[in-house]
């Protein structure tokens, strides 16, 4: 019976330890509730009393402004990565954080510039906010479709109220609001073509529970470029890549969470309601009649499609337009049929598809593995197929969007050919 008494002692000790842990958690939660006092704070904006907002202390300045109807852009979802939620605090600014120091110059910091996503509201503040952010609004959209257009990319199509059209420009983006949610990735098969199942099964991506029911609303927004152009309203489209954890032994690392916003979007089904806000953006078309070259990879397809369709189908532009699109294989290519149709219809539009890792089935269909302009990294194919033949590369406009490595490779290449940064429009917040 000695072993039984020993087992009993272990059980009692374990139970006591667990109970102590639960008690400590309860004490911490109660302490936060009763000891951390929430008090009203006034945000005086642009020295205009009519714009003064009263908010609760303790939240980020970004969240407080959003709750007050002032839609400061935060494409990265409040992670201090995009550096776009800049606000100047003209009175009562706290000491800058490291994220502020890495964003602003010493003079700007002294002037009160801060990242609103990192600044906590603890007392009254006086702010300067750009007037354009007062024009941003929110819309409720209904999911029309949410199908995979590549293994890890969905095309989310929403319908908004036609009596309230969203006044966006091609190259712009909207922020998608993510409510608390819980999903099982196996349910995503409902909006996924079976051709994509095998890759998901190889990496054990199905039957994964993603629980964000206790979501922190301060970080529950993310911006996505619009794949649609204004003439397609009341429909709006996005291309969204799922942010999986890193893979360990061909399975997602269980210690690292899935992307909050992309997982929410992948869980959406026709009929679901989605809140979007905006519009925002700076990567618009420069109307100077220079020929335009689009260098697009992956989910950057949103950015390219919006501009190209607007130029050709809406503005009937006669500018020379060239699209270089990079994908791993034909299965990962997006909007190929649409672009091939446009190329036949518009003599000023040229479409080049480049595959970095064509599948055997692609080769069986006739894809030329040995052609370096068709099978290559996109930046190398572009250099061989067009850039090296341009007499004056600096006379062109370059619109760039894709994964981080794609973007950096393109920027380095263009710099080597003497292209000024002012001739490059880069959309990289989603990288």
UniProtKB/Swiss-Prot annotation:
<comment type="similarity">
    <text>Belongs to the NqrF family.</text>
</comment>
<protein>
    <recommendedName>
        <fullName>Na(+)-translocating NADH-quinone reductase subunit F</fullName>
        <ecNumber>7.2.1.1</ecNumber>
    </recommendedName>
</protein>
<keyword id="KW-0830">Ubiquinone</keyword>
<dbReference type="InterPro" id="IPR010205">
    <property type="entry name" value="NqrF"/>
</dbReference>
<keyword id="KW-0813">Transport</keyword>
<dbReference type="InterPro" id="IPR017938">
    <property type="entry name" value="Riboflavin_synthase-like_b-brl"/>
</dbReference>
<feature type="region of interest" description="Catalytic">
    <location>
        <begin position="289"/>
        <end position="413"/>
    </location>
</feature>
<keyword id="KW-1133">Transmembrane helix</keyword>
<dbReference type="Pfam" id="PF00111">
    <property type="entry name" value="Fer2"/>
</dbReference>
<dbReference type="GO" id="GO:0051537">
    <property type="term" value="F:2 iron, 2 sulfur cluster binding"/>
</dbReference>
<dbReference type="GO" id="GO:0046872">
    <property type="term" value="F:metal ion binding"/>
</dbReference>
<keyword id="KW-0472">Membrane</keyword>
<dbReference type="GO" id="GO:0016655">
    <property type="term" value="F:oxidoreductase activity, acting on NAD(P)H, quinone or similar compound as acceptor"/>
</dbReference>
<dbReference type="InterPro" id="IPR039261">
    <property type="entry name" value="FNR_nucleotide-bd"/>
</dbReference>
<feature type="binding site">
    <location>
        <position position="117"/>
    </location>
    <ligand>
        <name>[2Fe-2S] cluster</name>
    </ligand>
</feature>
<keyword id="KW-0406">Ion transport</keyword>
<keyword id="KW-1003">Cell membrane</keyword>
<dbReference type="InterPro" id="IPR012675">
    <property type="entry name" value="Beta-grasp_dom_sf"/>
</dbReference>
<keyword id="KW-0001">2Fe-2S</keyword>
<comment type="function">
    <text>NQR complex catalyzes the reduction of ubiquinone-1 to ubiquinol by two successive reactions, coupled with the transport of Na(+) ions from the cytoplasm to the periplasm. The first step is catalyzed by NqrF, which accepts electrons from NADH and reduces ubiquinone-1 to ubisemiquinone by a one-electron transfer pathway.</text>
</comment>
<dbReference type="Pfam" id="PF00175">
    <property type="entry name" value="NAD_binding_1"/>
</dbReference>
<keyword id="KW-0274">FAD</keyword>
<keyword id="KW-0285">Flavoprotein</keyword>
<feature type="domain" description="2Fe-2S ferredoxin-type">
    <location>
        <begin position="41"/>
        <end position="133"/>
    </location>
</feature>
<keyword id="KW-0915">Sodium</keyword>
<keyword id="KW-0739">Sodium transport</keyword>
<keyword id="KW-0997">Cell inner membrane</keyword>
<dbReference type="GO" id="GO:0006814">
    <property type="term" value="P:sodium ion transport"/>
</dbReference>
<keyword id="KW-0479">Metal-binding</keyword>
<keyword id="KW-0812">Transmembrane</keyword>
<feature type="transmembrane region" description="Helical">
    <location>
        <begin position="10"/>
        <end position="30"/>
    </location>
</feature>
<dbReference type="InterPro" id="IPR001041">
    <property type="entry name" value="2Fe-2S_ferredoxin-type"/>
</dbReference>
<dbReference type="GO" id="GO:0009055">
    <property type="term" value="F:electron transfer activity"/>
</dbReference>
<feature type="binding site">
    <location>
        <position position="76"/>
    </location>
    <ligand>
        <name>[2Fe-2S] cluster</name>
    </ligand>
</feature>
<keyword id="KW-0520">NAD</keyword>
<keyword id="KW-1278">Translocase</keyword>
<keyword id="KW-0408">Iron</keyword>
<dbReference type="InterPro" id="IPR017927">
    <property type="entry name" value="FAD-bd_FR_type"/>
</dbReference>
<dbReference type="InterPro" id="IPR001433">
    <property type="entry name" value="OxRdtase_FAD/NAD-bd"/>
</dbReference>
<feature type="domain" description="FAD-binding FR-type">
    <location>
        <begin position="136"/>
        <end position="286"/>
    </location>
</feature>
<comment type="subunit">
    <text>Composed of six subunits; NqrA, NqrB, NqrC, NqrD, NqrE and NqrF.</text>
</comment>
<feature type="binding site">
    <location>
        <position position="82"/>
    </location>
    <ligand>
        <name>[2Fe-2S] cluster</name>
    </ligand>
</feature>
């Amino acid at each position: 019976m000695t072993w039984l008494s020993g087992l009993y002692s272990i059980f009692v000790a374990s139970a006591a330890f667990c109970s102590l842990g639960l008690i400590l958690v309860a004490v911490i939660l109660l302490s936060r509730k009763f000891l951390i006092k929430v008090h009203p704070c006034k945000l005086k904006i642009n020295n205009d009393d009519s714009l003064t907002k009263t908010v609760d202390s303790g939240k980020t300045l970004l969240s407080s402004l959003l709750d007050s109807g002032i839609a400061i852009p935060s494409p990265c979802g409040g992670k201090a990565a995009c550096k776009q939620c800049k606000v100047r605090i003209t009175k009562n600014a706290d000491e800058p954080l490291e994220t502020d120091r890495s964003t602003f110059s010493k003079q700007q910091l002294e002037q009160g510039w801060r990242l609103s996503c990192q600044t906590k509201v603890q007392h009254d503040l006086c702010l300067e906010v750009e007037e354009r952010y007062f024009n941003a609004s929110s819309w409720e959209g209904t999911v029309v479709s949410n199908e995979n257009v590549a293994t890890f990319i969905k095309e989310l199509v929403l319908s908004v109220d036609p009596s309230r059209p969203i006044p966006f420009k091609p190259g712009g983006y909207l922020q998608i609001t993510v409510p608390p949610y819980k999903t099982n990735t196996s349910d995503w098969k409902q909006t996924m073509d079976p051709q994509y199942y095998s890759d998901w099964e190889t990496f054990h991506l199905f039957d994964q529970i993603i629980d964000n029911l206790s979501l922190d609303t301060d970080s529950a927004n993310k911006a996505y470029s619009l794949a649609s152009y204004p003439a397609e309203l009341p429909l709006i489209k996005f291309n969204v890549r799922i942010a999986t954890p890193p893979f360990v032994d061909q399975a997602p690392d269980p210690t690292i969470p899935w992307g909050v916003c992309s997982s929410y979007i992948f869980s959406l089904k026709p009929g679901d309601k989605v809140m979007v806000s905006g519009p925002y953006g700076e990567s618009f078309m420069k109307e100077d009649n220079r020929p335009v070259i689009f260098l697009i990879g992956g989910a950057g397809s949103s950015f390219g499609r919006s501009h190209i369709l607007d130029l050709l189908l809406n503005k009937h532009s006669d500018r020379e337009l060239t699209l270089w699109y990079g994908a791993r294989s034909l299965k990962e290519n997006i909007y190929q049929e649409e672009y091939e149709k446009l190329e036949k219809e518009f003599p000023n539009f040229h479409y080049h598809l480049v595959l970095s890792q064509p599948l055997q089935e692609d080769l069986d269909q006739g894809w030329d593995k040995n052609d370096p302009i068709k099978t290559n990294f996109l930046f190398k194919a572009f250099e061989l197929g067009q850039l090296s033949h341009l007499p004056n590369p600096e006379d062109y406009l370059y619109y760039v969007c894709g994964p981080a490595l794609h973007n950096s490779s393109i920027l380095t290449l263009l710099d080597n050919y003497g292209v000024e940064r002012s001739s490059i429009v880069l959309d990289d917040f989603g990288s």
